[in-house]
Amino acid sequence: MKFVDSASVFVQAGDGGRGCVSFRREKFVPKGGPDGGDGGRGGHVWLETNSHLTTLLDFKYKNKYIAERGVHGQGARKTGKDGVEVVIQVPCGTIVRNAATGEVIADLTEDAQKILIARGGRGGRGNQHFATSTHQAPRHAEPGQKGEEFTLDLELKLMADVGLVGFPNAGKSTLISVVSAARPKIADYPFTTLVPNLGIVRYDDYKSFVMADIPGIIEGAAEGRGLGLQFLRHIERTKVLAILIAVDSPDIEAEYQTILGELEKFSATLLQKPRIVVITKMDVTDEPLALQLAGEQTPIFAISAVAGQGLKELKDALWRIIVAERAVPTNQVPQGGE
């Protein structure tokens, strides 16, 4: 399935039905009073999150949603039926903006979260409402109100606990494929991962968390080089960053500092997140890892996803951080990974 993380959508709520001009007509009541019914309300437009959706792809094929108008009122004081509402399904993590103003209307992060996005117009009143002692046969009624309409900009930020960050070929896709059921494309050339991948890591019977693998970052990503910048927003919601560096990197320290620099250029808040360093591909070397990053106390883990080396320790460490971060109130800024 193609991954799409932004879309524009036009939504229009239904207009209200027109009020009716009618007079009571019965066999023995030749001059009955007004009995025009009210028009029905136009259908609302709602947005609702669905945890089974992971992309905004559907909006590339359908980007206009128009609710039904209310039915017009009828005689005998019959109110028209309300218009059928429209419920638009979006993935969890969708940010909704008014395209005209840029205002954030909603940030939908919970499953089955439902918000009213465009309100249907009120039905017009029938002529029964306009009779007075001096004007007993009104021949006018109200039109229905117009339904609200907007163009919305939708932006998806994936909901994950762990964000995997690193240069191309650092082993991110291999790791997520081993510890979860995700099956990203894996090959020995740069930028094999072209879109983010999500995987659910389950272990020890009851522990589980969501891991996101994004395309590799290269130096200059913040200026648009490579693919990583396009998808960095998908790790903004994560609770912990795992920075992956291959053990055969020419300069692990320099690579680490480059990654931190690109993250900071994109958003300084990314460096406030807890982080760990994961040295990958330990199966290609017989040398024990002896590494201390200058000026850092960030935990370092050495793993081989292929051989299964160090994975239990890595998952345990990530789980401890996730549990601690889940306990942090949402209005409290998390501490950095120092």
From Swiss-Prot:
Residues 160-323 form the OBG-type G domain. The keyword Translocase does not apply. It is found in: Cytoplasm. It is an enzyme of class 3 (hydrolase). Its EC number is 3.6.5.-. Its cofactor is Mg(2+). InterPro entries: G_OBG, GTP-bd, GTP-bd_Obg/CgtA, GTP1-OBG_CS, GTP1_OBG_dom, GTP1_OBG_dom_sf, OBG_GTPase, P-loop_NTPase. Residues 1-159 form the Obg domain. One of its GO terms (cellular component) is cytoplasm. Residues 123-145 are annotated as: Disordered. GTP binds at residues 166-173, 191-195, 213-216, 280-283, 304-306. It comes from the Bacteria. Pfam families: GTP1_OBG, MMR_HSR1. PROSITE patterns: G_OBG, GTP1_OBG, OBG. GO terms for biological process: ribosome biogenesis. Keywords: Cytoplasm, GTP-binding, Hydrolase, Magnesium, Metal-binding, Nucleotide-binding. GO terms for molecular function: GTP binding; GTPase activity; magnesium ion binding. An essential GTPase which binds GTP, GDP and possibly (p)ppGpp with moderate affinity, with high nucleotide exchange rates and a fairly low GTP hydrolysis rate. Plays a role in control of the cell cycle, stress response, ribosome biogenesis and in those bacteria that undergo differentiation, in morphogenesis control. Monomer. NCBIfam families: Obg_CgtA, PRK12296.1, PRK12297.1, PRK12299.1. This is GTPase Obg. The gene is obg.
